[in-house]
């Protein structure tokens, strides 16, 4: 699973996820891309599950780029613990994704293969996604 090697602080505030993605919203590396349509908090497990779904479909063909990284810790208190007593321990890592953000890119495969691979991957992600091709945004 993806996670930062080290961080300045162990815990982070929840914050909000409003607005559109200003950067990272176009196809930069590959020929085809998977772009999110709604805001979400994507965990490292979901990123990895979607990556595995794409790789399983394209087999050894093509090159895949992951354009998001889980850099925010999500904390959780233990089960059956009363409120109070401070913030819980870091449980997992997530990435905040805004609408328009490109999450995965692929090259070296046909458009039909890329479209089907991204369709399989989008079922593993907690938001709606759309397919992009280079030059057609």
Swiss-Prot record:
Keyword RNA-binding: yes
Single GO MF annotation: tRNA binding
A single GO cellular-component term on record: cytosolic large ribosomal subunit
Pfam families: Ribosomal_L16 (PF00252)
Family affiliation: Belongs to the universal ribosomal protein uL16 family.
Oligomeric and partner information: Part of the 50S ribosomal subunit.
Name the record gives this protein: Large ribosomal subunit protein uL16
Organism the protein comes from: Sorangium cellulosum (strain So ce56) (Polyangium cellulosum (strain So ce56))
Name of the gene: rplP
């Amino acid at each position: 699973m993806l996670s930062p090697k080290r961080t300045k602080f162990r815990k982070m505030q929840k914050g909000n996820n409003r607005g559109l993605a200003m950067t990272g919203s176009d196809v930069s590396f590959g020929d085809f891309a998977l772009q999110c349509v709604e805001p979400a908090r994507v965990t490292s497990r979901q990123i990895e599950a979607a990556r595995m779904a794409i790789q399983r479909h394209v087999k050894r063909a093509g090159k895949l780029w992951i354009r998001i990284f889980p850099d925010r810790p999500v904390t959780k208190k233990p089960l059956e613990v009363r409120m109070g007593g401070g913030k819980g321990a870091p449980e997992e890592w997530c990435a905040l994704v805004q609408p328009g953000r490109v999450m995965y890119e692929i090259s070296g495969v046909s458009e039909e293969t890329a479209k089907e691979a991204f369709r399989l991957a989008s079922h593993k992600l907690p938001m709606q996604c759309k397919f992009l091709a280079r030059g057609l945004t």
